[in-house]
């Protein structure tokens, strides 16, 4: 079982991310230059954390993504996905089964909070 979106949000806040935007579909979180989204539609949590596409390669050494991409018009801080029928913003979705695993991933990807 994966962490629910609200649980992912709590871990992000614990490691120093702050809420930037709240929409019907997503929470946007910022820490310095780093930006992530919590997919509020991920009821089972498999795609609850969405990272910027430029982090895909570095992230792959830390965790397997849930799928190649996740598109959503609410991910305004991320680039547009132009290959689809509708041009929406996109990121790389991940799911985590424990808070410890998510914290380890975030610290590996973004470094420890200062």
Swiss-Prot record:
Pfam annotation, one family: DUF2002
Q: Which domain of life is it from?
A: Bacteria
Which InterPro entries does the record associate with it?
DUF2002
Q: What is this protein called?
A: Uncharacterized protein YgaC
The organism is Escherichia coli (strain K12)
């Amino acid at each position: 079982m994966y962490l629910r979106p609200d649980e992912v949000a709590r871990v992000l806040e614990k490691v120093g991310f702050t809420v930037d935007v709240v929409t019907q579909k997503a929470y946007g979180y910022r820490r310095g230059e780093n930006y992530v989204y919590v997919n509020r539609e991920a009821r089972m949590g498999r795609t609850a954390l969405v990272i910027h596409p430029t982090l895909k390669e570095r992230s792959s050494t830390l965790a397997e993504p849930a799928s190649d991409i996740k598109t959503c018009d609410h991910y305004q801080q991320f680039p547009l996905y132009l290959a689809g029928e509708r041009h929406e913003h996109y990121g790389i979705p991940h799911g985590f089964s424990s808070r410890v695993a998510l914290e380890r991933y975030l610290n590996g990807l973004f470094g420890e909070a200062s």
